[in-house]
């Protein structure tokens, strides 16, 4: 009887991702597990098919061989690479596991692998002021915690917990398929290495339950968008009582209506009046520490930069603060009265003529350049 396509068994397309394969396996294995379908031969066979499919598709090397050669890659006595003999079905994975296990303190069988829980991610948005000064934020995360009823064992109190007879407590099965030595999660105990007489009613034998947890996160001064804060042991609890993973808080700093940040420096545009630009004066500039006086020299133009040292963001590494860089924008007056317009006309007239290059050198230079351009253009037409 021809074997079914492994992707078809898991209800997937050939290009399925690792996560999709893992999710499909967990869903189908739970649905067709013998404990939930006692006495059903059909469910038992389906369960075996699911585990066999995942054993291949869940391993990158074996999946690549299957995609290229199909089931022939795992047949005894040969396969894709032309190897013969099949070594009489000996399980070399177990053989080497036992040898090296003895050398390093323990056999290859009977040892359950302790796998800590999953790492979690939490995206946290803060203001620029909070990023610069540092703050403490209260957050709530969705996580997996060890079941309080069974202490993470997955068994009802007083229930027998025995070593899984299929994997001998290791939680994994090794076998040879063709020229591959495979290792997969034990289909009987799902990797726990244990056989539970009565599963915990609270967690249904999983040992973990979904939970909302409130945490207080200290944000150090100087953080920026993309920085990650690691909270060790605040991730999901591990299976079978294993330690929890970590929580990574990813920082996102909101845009500010005045300042722009580039590393440890802050930038802002400072508008000044036409008169202040021409005559000079003193203005107030906003900083994250409050208002600061800034002297504007006479004849200041738009685009002039003023650097206020130490008014930026303190580096999380060196502790030294960057600078605040102010870019001047000379504001053109609007909504003028007739009298104000008349005064500006008189000022304009007084600046024209022979003294234009003295009072407005850029305008004078521009007009001279335009005149020369058209003069040369006229000569080339002749």
From Swiss-Prot:
Family: Belongs to the DnaJ family.
Pfam families in the cross-refs: DnaJ, DnaJ_C, DnaJ_CXXCXGXG
Chain positions of CXXCXGXG motif repeats: 147-154, 164-171, 186-193, 200-207
Keywords of the record: Chaperone, Cytoplasm, DNA replication, Metal-binding, Repeat, Stress response, Zinc, Zinc-finger
NCBIfam families: DnaJ_bact (TIGR02349), PRK10767.1 (NF008035)
Source species of the chain: Haemophilus influenzae (strain ATCC 51907 / DSM 11121 / KW20 / Rd)
Family matches, as CDD domains: DnaJ, DnaJ_C, DnaJ_zf
Binding site for Zn(2+) 2: 164, 167, 186, 189
Entry remark concerning the domains of this protein: The J domain is necessary and sufficient to stimulate DnaK ATPase activity. Zinc center 1 plays an important role in the autonomous, DnaK-independent chaperone activity of DnaJ. Zinc center 2 is essential for interaction with DnaK and for DnaJ activity.
GO CC, any one term: cytoplasm
Coiled-coil regions listed: none
Record-level Gene Ontology MF annotations: ATP binding; heat shock protein binding; unfolded protein binding; zinc ion binding
Positions of Zn(2+) 1 binding: 147, 150, 200, 203
Subunit structure: Homodimer.
Binding note for cofactor: Binds 2 Zn(2+) ions per monomer.
InterPro entries named in the record: DnaJ (IPR012724), DnaJ_C (IPR002939), DnaJ_domain (IPR001623), DnaJ_domain_CS (IPR018253), HSP40/DnaJ_pept-bd (IPR008971), HSP_DnaJ_Cys-rich_dom (IPR001305), HSP_DnaJ_Cys-rich_dom_sf (IPR036410), J_dom_sf (IPR036869)
Protein name stated in the entry: Chaperone protein DnaJ
Subcellular location as annotated: Cytoplasm
Cofactor(s) this protein cannot do without: Zn(2+)
Task performed by this protein: Participates actively in the response to hyperosmotic and heat shock by preventing the aggregation of stress-denatured proteins and by disaggregating proteins, also in an autonomous, DnaK-independent fashion. Unfolded proteins bind initially to DnaJ; upon interaction with the DnaJ-bound protein, DnaK hydrolyzes its bound ATP, resulting in the formation of a stable complex. GrpE releases ADP from DnaK; ATP binding to DnaK triggers the release of the substrate protein, thus completing the reaction cycle.
């Amino acid at each position: 009887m021809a074997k079914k396509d492994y992707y078809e068994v898991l209800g997937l397309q050939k290009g399925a991702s690792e996560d999709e394969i893992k999710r499909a396996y967990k869903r189908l294995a739970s649905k067709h597990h013998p404990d939930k379908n006692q006495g059903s031969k059909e469910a038992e066979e389906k369960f075996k098919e699911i585990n066999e499919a995942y054993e291949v598709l869940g391993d990158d090397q074996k999946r690549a061989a299957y995609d290229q050669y199909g089931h022939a890659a795992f047949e005894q006595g040969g396969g894709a690479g032309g190897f013969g003999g099949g070594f009489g079905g000996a399980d070399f994975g177990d053989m080497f596991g036992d040898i090296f296990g003895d050398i390093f303190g323990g056999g290859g069988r009977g040892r359950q692998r302790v796998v800590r829980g999953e790492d979690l991610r939490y995206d946290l948005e803060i203001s620029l002021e909070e990023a610069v000064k540092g703050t403490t934020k209260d957050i709530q995360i969705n996580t997996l915690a060890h079941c309080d009823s069974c202490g993470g064992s997955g068994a009802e109190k007083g229930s027998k917990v025995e070593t899984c007879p299929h994997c001998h407590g290791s939680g994994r099965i090794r076998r040879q398929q063709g020229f591959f030595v495979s290792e997969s999660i034990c289909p009987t105990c799902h990797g726990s290495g244990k056989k539970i007489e009565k599963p915990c009613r609270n967690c249904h034998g999983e040992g973990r339950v979904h939970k909302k947890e409130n945490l207080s996160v200290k944000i150090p001064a100087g953080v920026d968008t993309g920085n990650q804060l690691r909270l060790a042991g605040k991730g999901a609890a591990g299976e079978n009582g294993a330690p929890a993973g970590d929580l990574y808080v990813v920082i996102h700093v909101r845009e500010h209506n005045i300042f722009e940040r580039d590393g440890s420096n802050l930038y802002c545009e400072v508008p000044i009046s036409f008169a202040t630009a021409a005559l000079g004066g003193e203005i107030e500039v906003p900083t994250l520490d409050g208002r600061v006086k800034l002297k504007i020299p006479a004849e200041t133009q738009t685009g002039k930069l003023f650097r206020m040292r130490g008014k930026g963001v303190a580096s999380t590494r060196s502790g030294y603060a960057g600078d605040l860089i102010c870019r001047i924008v000379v504001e053109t007056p609007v909504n003028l009265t007739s009298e104000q317009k008349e005064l500006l006309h008189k000022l304009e007239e007084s600046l024209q003529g022979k003294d234009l290059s003295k009072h407005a050198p850029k305008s004078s230079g521009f007009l001279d350049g335009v005149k020369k351009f058209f003069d040369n253009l006229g000569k080339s037409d002749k």
